[in-house]
UniProtKB/Swiss-Prot annotation:
Lineage: Eukaryota, Viridiplantae, Streptophyta, Embryophyta, Tracheophyta
Keyword terms of this UniProt record: ATP-binding, Cell junction, Cytoplasm, Kinase, Nucleotide-binding, Phosphoprotein, Serine/threonine-protein kinase, Transferase
A Gene Ontology molecular function term of the record: protein serine/threonine kinase activity
Residue ranges, compositional bias (Low complexity): 371-382
Protein name in the entry: Casein kinase 1-like protein 1
Biased composition (Basic and acidic residues): 328-342
Protein kinase domain ranges (all copies): 9-278
InterPro entries hit by this protein: CK1_Ser-Thr_kinase, Kinase-like_dom_sf, Prot_kinase_dom, Protein_kinase_ATP_BS, Ser/Thr_kinase_AS
Family matches, as SMART domains: S_TKc
Organism of origin: Arabidopsis thaliana (Mouse-ear cress)
Amino acid sequence: MEPRVGNKFRLGRKIGSGSFGEIYLGTNIHTNEELAIKLENVKTKHPQLLYESKLYRILQGGTGVPNVKWFGVEGDYNVLVMDLLGPSLEDLFNFCSRKLSLKSVLMLADQMINRVEFFHSKSFLHRDLKPDNFLMGLGRRANQVYIIDFGLAKKYRDSTTHQHIPYRENKNLTGTARYASMNTHLGIEQSRRDDLESLGYILMYFLKGSLPWQGLKAGTKKQKYERISEKKVSTSIEALCRGYPSEFASYFHYCRSLRFDDKPDYAYLKRIFRDLFIREGFQFDYVFDWTILKYQQSQLTAPPSRALNPAVGTSAALPPGISNIDRYTGEEEGRPHMESSRRRVSGALDNSGNISNQPTSSSARDSMIPSSSLFAQSAGSSRRVTAVSGSRDNFPGSEELLQRSRTGDVSRGVIPRNSPGEAGKSTRRHYESVVKGIDNLQVSDEHHPH
């Protein structure tokens, strides 16, 4: 007899595991919808699934928050049934040879700030923001960023009175040392400013490929955290952001200027990145680096490459051959008091090269390759010519930004325009031929629940 949980969910193959238990692919026996099922032994030393399920319930309905289908106890296990999601940003970062373009980073930043703002609006801090804890959706939501893993979240204010928790010092490090804020390293109680600083480190990690305090050697875990802290404190914002647009330094300066109980101006942070996005001449079309790479691979292989494996409320897709040391065990830069709640299973997608610094030249469909969104590159130019897909993730501000990018209505500067000429004509001819050729492009939906 096939194993079931909650009398309506079929337990399938294991797709991941972690210190808290196992992650399985599940199916709703009534609708045949694929889901993620987390199992945690009721006798585990640090139970977190019940707490996490309560937070998911509080956050239900928010954009980019996985839906919880069921929580309960089956035999010796706590069980959480929730949406099946796509690969994590760490997976996709690895897939793109560990570097993302400015365009991709800015499109992600807009959604990620929104997710953190929503989390804070519900009176909670995440306290463990990292690329592994942001996942992309599947199917029609493949361009939407989801936030997951609330095991270390903490309520920072009273939900009714909004009375903030008191300032405290001598706190142990909670979260992942690589992305922890300076104040967290210094033992100061975390607040909203610290989540945002962690997000800034994630963005620089995507742009640079690594952070200055990675790869430091030490004898013990405690010494490791101390070395990371020393390096982080000694690395100025200007040094960290050198070679990249000044908006990133402005982001960090703003985060570090906040007092302990200040409410951040999330709109300001989104605005500086949106204005940069417009000045660069980008189109808000949801064509990410991995979208282009996946399309390029589909053109080079027959049959086309399979999509990245779907994941659970924790990600389960990782292209083979990619080493990502100490992302889960905590031995390198993980959690000092609680092991990460995930391990990853291999995906099936190979990466043939890093396209982060290459001009974009192809297109994509909604799941990974939107058929009506593509780039056409003119000779010697990195300017984009884009037909924008009508099926977008409607997170706040995207339509406004798209309209501004079309009209050039920007508060800080004007988009430079290429002069017409043979290069432009060549671009248009190439664009038209690609549009004709891509109309019939089919991508397998075998892993998509929708």
